[in-house]
Amino acid sequence: MVEQIKDKLGRPIRDLRLSVTDRCNFRCDYCMPKEVFGDDFVFLPKNELLTFDEMARIAKVYAELGVKKIRITGGEPLMRRDLDVLIAKLNQIDGIEDIGLTTNGLLLKKHGQKLYDAGLRRINVSLDAIDDTLFQSINNCNIKATTILEQIDYATSIGLNVKVNVVIQKGINDDQIIPMLEYFKDKHIEIRFIEFMDVGNDNGWDFSKVVTKDDMLTMIEQHFEIDPVEPKYFGEVAKYYRHKDNGVQFGLITSVSQSFCSTCTRARLSSDGKFYGCLFATVDGFNVKAFIRSGVTDEELKEQFKALWQIRDDRYSDERTAQTVANRQRKKINMNYIGG
């Protein structure tokens, strides 16, 4: 029987984000900049990662507390060996209605069919430019945008439902909004533009680099005829619009200018096995991995997860100002540990 629990701000728990690795084959400046994550950077050893059995056990307990959706993140999750094994395990859990995965897309041709066969049906591909030269400068690994576009075509050809995520930075890739919207509109693929966020400690974020949803919308309305779309469910993070001529939708994610803390229903498990109640959390999350490996029962695990959720009061984006960003004393967990 599913228990209905809420946090201190009255928010239910509906989603679980599982980071399966801290490794990535890109070095995007806003997430894993090359000067920080260089050749000598020490990533987590295998024994510091949760096993697939541990993840499935955690997901099963969370399902009993109301979680219906699971998203697999990283790092780059396709770098975790035998990920299809985890997908298959998660698909067997009662109450889990949706499993998604966020990826940079580079390894979709290599692993996509196995993941589909294991039950994965929905992926988000991160692609911050459609121009090859610009995209190479963003990922810092000489990967062309056309390479990822080919991977996306492959993913759709095998039956995966693909959405594309684009982090927009002022003066870097804001000129990509219109060409990317045009390209994916013609492909009938949903694209979502995300305001640049201050996740982690190494991405050089400040307010001047943010292109707000209103600015994006003004730009888009000069080129396309669109209508707003009503939210589909409580906690939906994107504001959706529909092209009038062919009905294809796109989204704008207002993570800075119009926060959605009040409807956030996500629990997050980092690649090193810690619980966090917020994408912008500090680095002292509850160590679920150590707790599980101490020999606790499922009932003890459930009680711990209940307690963690019921004391949750995170609302970082509601409280974000230039001063709070500058004065934040405690380091936030980096993106490669907690996913997007």
Curated annotation (Swiss-Prot):
- Needed co-factor(s): [4Fe-4S] cluster
> Where is [4Fe-4S] cluster 2 annotated to bind?
261, 264, 278
What does the record's cofactor remark say about binding? Answer: Binds 2 [4Fe-4S] clusters. Binds 1 [4Fe-4S] cluster coordinated with 3 cysteines and an exchangeable S-adenosyl-L-methionine and 1 [4Fe-4S] cluster coordinated with 3 cysteines and the GTP-derived substrate.
Superkingdom to which the source organism belongs: Bacteria
Quick one: a GO biological-process term for this protein?
Mo-molybdopterin cofactor biosynthetic process
Q: Per UniProt, what is one GO molecular function of this protein?
A: cyclic pyranopterin monophosphate synthase activity
Give a yes or no for keyword Nucleotidyltransferase in this entry: no
PROSITE patterns hit by this protein: MOAA_NIFB_PQQE, RADICAL_SAM
Positions of GTP binding: 17, 71, 102, 163, 266-268
List the protein's name.
GTP 3',8-cyclase
- Provide the family line: Belongs to the radical SAM superfamily. MoaA family.
Q: Would the keyword Transport be found if you checked this record's keyword annotation?
A: no
Which InterPro entries would you find in this protein's record?
Aldolase_TIM, Elp3/MiaA/NifB-like_rSAM, MoaA, MoaA_NifB_PqqE_Fe-S-bd_CS, MoaA_twitch, MoCo_biosynth_MoaA/MoaC, rSAM
Q: Which organism is it from?
A: Staphylococcus aureus (strain bovine RF122 / ET3-1)
What keywords are annotated for this sequence in UniProt?
Answer: 4Fe-4S, GTP-binding, Iron, Iron-sulfur, Lyase, Metal-binding, Molybdenum cofactor biosynthesis, Nucleotide-binding, S-adenosyl-L-methionine
The opening ranks of the lineage are: Bacteria, Bacillati, Bacillota, Bacilli, Bacillales
Assembly state and interactors?
Monomer and homodimer.
* Membrane-spanning ranges: none
- Function in brief: Catalyzes the cyclization of GTP to (8S)-3',8-cyclo-7,8-dihydroguanosine 5'-triphosphate.
